């Protein structure tokens, strides 16, 4: 089950896991576990990742289609 989009965002921005690990002050193995969805970052780490990558936290946990569909559902009610 895919729970986060960190890998996709890293790929889109051309950023390596090693680079992110260094800027997050985490081990490569920790970041790799996030990227491979073996473990999930806590909210504090997710916020740090979003700031480092320059994206909204929502971009790390859902793709554009999911956000679009979610907005459609909210607007119909």
What are the functions of these language-model segments?
Residues 44-59:
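DNA major-groove recognition helix of helix-turn-helix/homeodomain DNA-binding modules
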Residues 18, 29, 58:
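Key DNA-contact positions within bacterial/archaeal DNA-binding proteins
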Residues 25-40:
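Recognition helix of helix-turn-helix/homeodomain-like DNA-binding domains
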């Amino acid at each position: 089950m895919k729970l986060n989009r960190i890998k996709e965002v890293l790929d889109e921005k051309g950023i390596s896991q090693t680079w992110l690990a260094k800027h997050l002050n985490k081990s490569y193995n920790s970041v790799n576990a996030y990227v491979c969805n073996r473990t999930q970052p806590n909210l504090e780490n997710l916020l740090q990742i979003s700031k480092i990558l320059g994206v909204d936290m929502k971009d790390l946990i859902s793709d554009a289609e999911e956000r679009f569909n979610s907005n459609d559902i909210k607007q119909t009610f």
